[in-house]
Regions:
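Acidic/His-rich structured neighborhood in mature extracellular/periplasmic domains
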Residues: 23-169
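N-terminal mature-domain "stem" immediately C-terminal to a signal peptide or N-terminal signal-anchor/transmembrane
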Residues: 1-32
């Protein structure tokens, strides 16, 4: 129930009045991608275990942080999020982790959205990294506006350092 509202309003950007027809359009357009994802992600234990390990480190390093209770996977539009934090869950958009050579990313539309240097990280092994990046961003919101480039680089380096310690392997 909680994620459904987030999915419909924030990911699909559906207005309540247009929900049913737009939802049907999305469903029919993305059903083939969903079917492909079920074969690619038959076995998600490895990614789920790494996220759980990251949660254990989070609990150790940030004991007051409220960890997500659930891990949810979904298929969203190609230009949607790779991971989303809700009040009680972390949701992973599998459409951005189908493998770097997936036709979705190598197509003209895919390359316009995500050039090769970006889509090379659209592998299942990057799911835990994306999840932990999102959590680190929740703990330390971006404050780079108006800062010099070197300060922004240092800020990003600090985030990478924290993520490296949450996912040590």
């Amino acid at each position: 129930p909680g994620f459904t509202t987030v999915f419909l309003s924030n990911i699909l950007a559906l207005m309540p009045a247009s929900e049913s027809s737009d939802l049907k359009s999305f469903y029919s357009a993305y059903l083939p991608l969903y079917k492909q994802s079920t074969s690619i992600f038959k076995e998600q234990k490895k990614q789920a275990q790494k996220i759980e390990q990251g949660f254990q480190y989070l609990k150790h390093y940030f004991p007051s942080y409220q960890l997500p209770n659930k891990l949810i996977t979904f298929i969203g539009p190609i230009n949607s999020f790779g991971s989303i934090l809700t009040e009680d869950a972390i949701a992973i958009g599998l459409q951005l982790f189908m493998g770097k050579d997936h036709p979705l990313y190598t197509s003209e539309e895919g390359q316009a959205l995500y050039p090769s240097y970006v889509s090379r990280k659209f592998e299942p092994s990057y799911i835990p990294v994306s999840a932990m990046n999102n959590i680190v961003l929740d703990i330390y919101p971006e404050q780079m506006s108006g800062k010099p480039l070197i300060a922004q680089i240092v800020e990003l380096g600090k985030r990478m350092y924290v993520v490296d310690h949450l996912l040590p392997q």
